[in-house]
């Protein structure tokens, strides 16, 4: 009997490319989102490094007073930054080919817009890639949902806030001191510390840190004993072993006695959902707060609302914050305007001594 073997027709180059992109056997999963993520993030990182080292000063306020941000122009790691695109450009799309020369593009802060736009695309695609890999492995999609919190925060400070304020020059500078400057000016102009959504974000971040530390220390301490009481419990384990070492019943009992019974989770899924949801929801709220303050819906300002029976103002901590805000607003962008908006109003605010 003769067997005839037919050679399978070689698949096309495109089919092989599609198979490689979507394969979960690769050391690093690429995915269709990765096809966009990889070049955009590489572009953002490359331009950031070059600009941080060598970019010339940028006319951020659009008043012909360039601000230096790179290492070669006198900065160090702490003071250096990618200076935001000039106020003279506003919200206009400003790629290299829109400028008369590369020198003009650099002077007007073109690299900032290039980095921010590519970075934004890259992190959105990273989130999509998380979902895509979860989908291909038959997992649920909550990893990408959790990652949406930092994506929302970055979108708020780099995209939404400049749109609301009318210029990319109001975006957050890409550097340490620049970030602090952004925070101080944001407080001066929007009173973010008195915004409930920022308060929820603080509770989310600090609460998440606390719960993470509590959970990690409790799991590390709740070992299933493999030794006699005369030996160290640690002697029964090897670092990185595959066998389960954690007893949730013991951990639940410990924590229930330390605080009270219902403060402790006895269900692992409920516990880990809580650990994920607490900081994620807090950061969502902060991003939402930044996005509303972008359009000048600001934090609470009680405007010296506590008065005695004679109508005299009784200063509260809120009034002290207001006074600090005025000082910070006076000091920023000193040459861009004669008076900050708050101080240029018809009636000067009373500070009562």
Swiss-Prot record:
Site entry: Cleavage: 344-345
Pfam families on file: Photo_RC
Binding locations of [CaMn4O5] cluster: 170, 189, 332-333, 342, 344
Membrane protein topology class: Multi-pass membrane protein
Superkingdom of this protein's organism: Eukaryota
Site (Tyrosine radical intermediate): 161
Keyword Chloroplast: yes
Annotated propeptide span(s): 345-353
Binding site for chlorophyll a ChlzD1: 118
Protein name as catalogued: Photosystem II protein D1
Record organism: Tupiella akineta
